[in-house]
Amino acid sequence: MGYLFGKKSFRKGKALKKYKVNQGICCDGKYIYSVFERKKSHTCKIRKFTFDNKTIKVSDKLHIGHGNDITYKGGNLYITHSKGGNVIHVVSASTLKKRGDQHVKGFPKKISDHPSFNAIAAIPQGFALKLMGSQRIIIVNDNFKYIRSFKMSKKIPVSPQGMEYNDGKLYRVYSNFQKSKNKVAVFNMKGKLLKTYHIKVNGEAEGIFFCAHKFYMSIYHKYKKKKHKKKYKARLYYLKQIQ
């Protein structure tokens, strides 16, 4: 495990000055996309950048809620709104402009009358969505039509964050705020817990993505450099212990 950019933050540039909290993160195989939230305005921006931390593009202000998870598929970015109801925001990966919204079709009312989602991962069949306030994963096709669902077999007793899919398994990030007790839990596609990794790094784990046979985890690190002055860093880690 190690820093991808050494001690440098991947939140950089004047465009992100007021967008201090990194949220969801993903990769298209070449570029990395990270959501940054401006908490007081409840708006976000997306930074598209390279593996050597060079900015390709920063989006304009986006009304995408908390923006707590993001995934890439077919030229688009799909972003969870968290408490915004049955909606997934769609943003062009090339222009970083919003293209519209998707809604899960045929969602069973016996599961939830008012579903919302706080994690998303692209999978071969379509997408896996984490139902807000539940241990349930929803599987939809590429048109967001409901296929099936399952419950994760074990609740991890810290805050759930982003999610990634690879080789028939879901990788879910958990954090304990800024207490540096971060975890990655691995589940199969029936919800069975296969393994839990304990990641001891400074800050709060926010997201995870897989690229070129490697896993990476994003960290939101809040600290005080001077008295009464808070500093924020978005740091990216290579998780070499996860194969």
Regions found by a protein language model. Give the residues of each.
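Blade-loop segments of beta-propeller domains
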Residues: N53-S82
